[in-house]
Amino acid sequence: MSAPGMDKRKLSTSGDSLYEILGLPKTATGDDIKKTYRKLALKYHPDKNPDNVDAADKFKEVNRAHSILSNQTKRNIYDNYGSLGLYIAEQFGEENVNAYFVVTSPAVKAVVICCAVITGCCCCCCCCCCCNFCCGKFKPPVNESHDQYSHLNRPDGNREGNDMPTHLGQPPRLEDVDLDDVNLGAGGAPVTSQPREQAGGQPVFAMPPPSGAVGVNPFTGAPVAANENTSLNTTEQTTYTPDMVNQKY
């Protein structure tokens, strides 16, 4: 009957049993713990009680209480989380005790339960990450503009006929034509001559040379036959205002 009670007391979260063993309050200082431990150790030492089994057990409990309460880190864990905190510190480390109790707190559990209910036990995450929308069957379409340039990195260098853009019977635009698909001839030779007139095409007419253009000097009003050597001003004097040419001073 004592073993279940001992296990239950060790895993308590109150943090009072070790202080009760030493007969001290939780506000006791380190010196008070040392003095009380020495008195109880001398009182229940096995050498003074050779045939007393209860005294031996009491001596073990006093030693355990002193080893925990004399360590400031373990004492803080015990004061906050009781014997259960000491057990968690032995399993996961003293630095992870606070994180363990935060994760297992009722508030965090309530948030997890609410998220599970809203998402249908995280069914949305499973469909997106694990099942990939039924092996890609219901996967959202990718950006369509990406497919327009997919032929640039194809391994065979040729595009199938169904990959060419359709323009309702019109010839493809220059920007839509793949330059790699243009045939340079039957033997692959480069083009060295201009294209000739095809049969049934429009006739070509030679245009006469342009006649000599006759202009008017804007400053003098005299007619001028303009050519490539004609200047805008036929006089050598630089004139900035036409009205001032005939002005007398």
UniProtKB/Swiss-Prot annotation:
GO terms for cellular component: plasma membrane; synaptic vesicle; terminal bouton; type Ib terminal bouton; type Is terminal bouton. Residues 146-177, 218-249 are annotated as: Disordered. InterPro entries: DnaJ_C_subfamily_member5, DnaJ_domain, DnaJ_domain_CS, J_dom_sf. GO terms for biological process: exocytosis; neuron cellular homeostasis; protein folding; regulation of neuromuscular synaptic transmission; synaptic vesicle exocytosis. Residues 146-162 have a biased composition (Basic and acidic residues). The keyword Secreted does not apply. The modification Phosphothreonine is found at residue 13. Keywords: Chaperone, Lipoprotein, Membrane, Palmitate, Phosphoprotein. Fatty acylated. Heavily palmitoylated in the cysteine string motif. Residues 227-241 have a biased composition (Polar residues). Its main location: membrane. The keyword Disulfide bond does not apply. May have an important role in presynaptic function. This is DnaJ homolog subfamily C member 5 homolog. It comes from Drosophila melanogaster. The gene is Csp.
